[in-house]
Amino acid sequence: MPSTVEILKQELPNYLHHIKNKNSEEAKKQYCISSLFGKIFDVASEDLDFEVPTKTVSKLRGRADTLFQNIIFEWKQDAKNSKAIDDGEIELKKYFQHFLEKEPLKKYVGIITDGIIFKPYLPIIEKNKVTSLSITNELNISKTSPEDIFYWFDNYLGKSEKIKLTSKSIKMQFGLDSPNFVAIRNELKNLFDAVRDYKDVKLKFENWSHYLEIVYGEKQKEENLFFKHTYLSTLVKLIVHLKLSSMESNRTDEILPILFGNRFAQFGIVNFSEEDFFTWPMQITIRT
């Protein structure tokens, strides 16, 4: 049975030829759903909801074009048209606010697309209000290899087949341009805002800034850089642990021992992952 990447290699030229000749948003939507989502990525039409009505507490109404699990698709005739994108972003903010009020624990992604260009967005949330949008790793399938197209869609559509672990697949899934990082960075910002005045957290941030001053010649006060370092430090610890444990253990109760370094000592590795500047999200006030 051919892999998804092999199917993409076979079907992509024909898909691009036809999608470029569709002259309406509806035609592009129908063709993309049946050919790209259905034929290549096995997304069944019955798993999609169309024209989903939305309404916020402030009575802003909308109608989401297509909903698949936690993904909101906003279809456009031309995703290179700046006005169309601006209009789409306004609509996505309404949809995000609706779903935040309806399902506050569920994380939604919005994608503005014309079937060729896919622009994914995540909401920036402050005090239970969607204040702005953050765009992540935009995809143009006419300029991207079948392998990278597969990795990109796997981030959102969740293919069941196993992905070979390579530096490229890790970067696509967890890199600083990935939706995973953008979502976690937003969560880290909200957490940091809640505990920034705690003595231990403040000390970690100040010590981190001091050490970077030695490297760069001036103190680093950029919180986004601190969040990046926190994310990357945590990710490395988790990946190394998965490798050492042969990926046999994924229990959430092991997260604390991994991040504080205790689990690595059990493998005979010391001074690799002791408590550092980036364990601040493990503050008891956050965990409780």
Give the positions of each predicted feature.
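Short hydrophobic/aromatic-rich motifs at helix boundaries and adjacent loops
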Residues: T4-I7, D65, W208, L212
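Active-site metal-binding core of divalent-cation-utilizing nuclease and nuclease-like domains
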Residues: I40-Q69
